[in-house]
C-alpha cells in the first residue's frame, strides 16, 4: 500500500443506512445544526495537512489510529497557491493518538492536523454554522415570493410635489414609500419562520428522491434517510416545503419529525387529511411504509 494518501467522501449518511443511524446518535444537538458525515480513509502518513473548519465537528476514529495535533491560534494565514486551505504557521498546543471508538470535538476555526498511523478510517460528523450574509440572502429570496401579496397594491402618490431644480435627486417621499412597502411585506412574523424552516430543510443539491410505491393503506411510516423534517409552533417543514399545522395532526407530525417514524398505533390517531398528506409524501419518496 502506498504511503501518504487520503480519500475523503462527503455526505455518506445520505447513501448508507448504517452511517445515517450513526448520525442519529448526535441528535442531542438540534437537527437545524446537523450537516453530514464525511469518511476519511488514509494510508500510513496520510492527511489533509494543518487546516481549520468554519463549523463544529466531531472526529470519530473508526479503524486504525490517527494522530491529531490541535491548537487555538489567531494566525489563520494560509499557504499561497495551494488548492487546499493549508495553514502557513501551524502551532499545535495538544497532541493525541485516537484509537477506534475515540472521539475528538473541535469548535469552528480550531486549527488541527490529523496524520494516519498505518491504515485508518475517521468519521467526521459536521454541523452547519449559518453565516449572516448567506442566511439573509436565502431568507429574502424566499420572503420575496409572497411580498407582493403581503405589501398590498397601494400606489405611490406625490400630488403635493413641487417643481424641482435638481431632478436627479431622490425624492424623500419615495424613499419613505419604499421603506413602508418593505415593512408591510415583513409584518407577518410567521412569514420569517416559514422561510427559515423551508431553508433549513432544503435538500442538498446532490439529493434526489425516487417515486415510492403507493400502499393501499398506511400502517406505519418512516422518513427516508435523506429527508429533512423540522417544525416550529405553527408549521411543519419537510424537504424545503411547509404546511400550517395545529391540534392532534400537528402533534403527530412533530413526533414523526422527532422520531423519524410513526407506529400503527400512532397513525390511527391521524385525520384523513394527515393520512392523505402522508400518502402524498410516500409517492414523492420522502416517506416510506415501515412494515
List the model feature ranges, each with a label:
Residues 183-257, 279, 290-291:
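Acidic, low-complexity/disordered tracts enriched in E/D and polar residues
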Residues 252-270:
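Short acidic, hydrophobic short linear motifs in intrinsically disordered regions
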Residues 1-102, 110, 115-155:
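Active-site region of the double-stranded beta-helix
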Residues 268-283:
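Short amphipathic alpha-helical interaction segments
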Residues 105-107, 290:
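Residue-level recognition of conserved beta-strand edge/terminus positions
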Residues 140-216:
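C-terminal amphipathic alpha-helical segment
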